[in-house]
């Protein structure tokens, strides 16, 4: 079992590492490529576009051909794209490399969640996804620090060679450690069950909405945090970094505590708690009389996301024993596109950073609470259908 957990965690980590590690080198990259930092900031969106494009096909291929045939090319593409970025001499080539990086990371991301669905029952999967959420919270803090240390002695290209090295490690895991977890092709008697695993299932769609809104909350916070903390609240750059590190610490602490909470409380209780924390954060930020109260509201955001997201993802994947790859892809596409669409629309309409965050917090909590209360899980999948054993 440990091999599946290690491989899944490694496959997921390519996604945040690809986002956060290169940011510290952005000024030097812009200077070397004769581009402005503003022009290269689109590299974030290009990377996410690559991930979304990968998810359009990766899930279906993983369900038909297996998890390894998607993970291995995905890791290989991430390696090649990282080297391509390091060799880029124009901003256009650099952005093309970032898109290819996103394609590779997207393939690995989809496979990671499909593997967890294949190998864990509902309760254990919720615990593991909460732990995974805690680990991914470390990356936005550690990756820029690692990038800074690398750039003290080496040029910016070394950041992408480091990513390529990570990709090589994950490729080796996928080749030699990971075993195939895709369920055997269904017998004729199982065809009705395969056909019943519809993506239009009300329960699945409700969890897609909940997780997409939750990701929109956390990405809105990440995108608006420099404006909120430095421009509006007046913190210096060093103080901003400290606050972000502390919020990541809150996220990690809550994420690592959630598996223990699942041993005491029902998953539904934790999901309701998550949305109540979002609502409390929105109200706190809306009426905050001081910076200290606002910072408390920000910690509620991190706690709310960490306590509920892993549980909601586990519930979303629960109905899909034979189509876990497609379900994982659908979740990923909805989360990436939905959150990006909200942030873009809010910017186009001219909603300020503060109101943008408050608005998504309150909308997410109200919509999600209604869905949690009125759309309950269907019939649990039987134990022999839930966990697939492999040699």
Curated annotation (Swiss-Prot):
Any GO BP: response to antibiotic
Superkingdom assignment: Bacteria
CC annotations in GO: plasma membrane
Pfam short name (any one): MFS_1
Transmembrane regions listed in the UniProt entry: 4-24, 42-62, 69-89, 93-113, 131-151, 158-178, 203-222, 243-263, 269-289, 293-313, 331-351, 356-376
Function: Confers resistance to chloramphenicol.
Protein name: Multidrug resistance protein MdtL
Organism listed in the record: Escherichia coli O7:K1 (strain IAI39 / ExPEC)
Name of encoding gene: mdtL
């Amino acid at each position: 079992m440990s091999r599946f957990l290690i491989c899944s965690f490694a496959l997921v980590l390519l996604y945040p590492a690809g986002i956060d590690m290169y940011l510290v080198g952005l000024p030097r990259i812009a200077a070397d490529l004769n581009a402005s930092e503003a022009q290269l900031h689109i590299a974030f969106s290009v990377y996410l576009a690559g991930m979304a494009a990968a998810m359009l096909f990766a899930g279906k291929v993983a369900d038909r051909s297996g998890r390894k045939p998607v993970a291995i090319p995905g890791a290989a593409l991430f390696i090649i794209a990282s080297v391509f970025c390091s060799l880029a001499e124009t901003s256009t080539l650099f952005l093309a490399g970032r898109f290819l990086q996103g394609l590779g990371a997207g393939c690995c991301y989809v496979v990671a969640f499909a593997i967890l669905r294949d190998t864990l029952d509902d309760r254990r999967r919720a615990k593991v996804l909460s732990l995974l959420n805690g680990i991914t919270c470390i990356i936005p803090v550690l990756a820029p620090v690692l990038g800074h240390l690398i750039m003290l002695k080496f040029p910016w290209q070394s950041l992408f060679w480091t990513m390529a090295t990570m990709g090589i490690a994950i490729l080796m895991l996928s080749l030699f450690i990971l075993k195939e977890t895709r369920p055997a092709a269904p017998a004729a008697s199982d065809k009705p069950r395969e056909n019943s695993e519809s993506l239009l299932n009300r329960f699945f769609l409700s969890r897609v909405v909940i997780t997409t809104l939750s990701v929109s909350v956390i990405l809105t916070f990440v995108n608006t945090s420099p404006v909120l903390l430095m421009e509006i609240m007046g913190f210096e750059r060093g103080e901003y970094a400290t606050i972000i590190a502390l919020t990541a610490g809150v996220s990690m602490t809550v994420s690592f505590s959630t598996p223990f909470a699942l041993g005491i409380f029902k998953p539904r209780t934790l999901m309701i708690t998550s949305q109540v924390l979002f609502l409390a954060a929105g109200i706190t930020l809306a009426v905050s009389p001081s910076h200290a109260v606002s910072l408390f509201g920000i910690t509620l955001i991190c706690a709310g996301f960490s306590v509920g997201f892993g549980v909601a993802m586990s519930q979303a994947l629960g109905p899909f024993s034979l189509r876990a790859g497609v379900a994982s892809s659908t979740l990923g596409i909805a989360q990436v596109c939905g959150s990006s669409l909200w942030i873009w629309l809010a910017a186009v309409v001219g909603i300020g950073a503060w109101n943008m965050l408050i608005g998504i917090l309150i909308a997410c909590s109200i919509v999600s609470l209604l869905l949690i209360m009125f759309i309950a899980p269907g019939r649990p999948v039987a134990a022999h259908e839930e966990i697939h054993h492999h040699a």
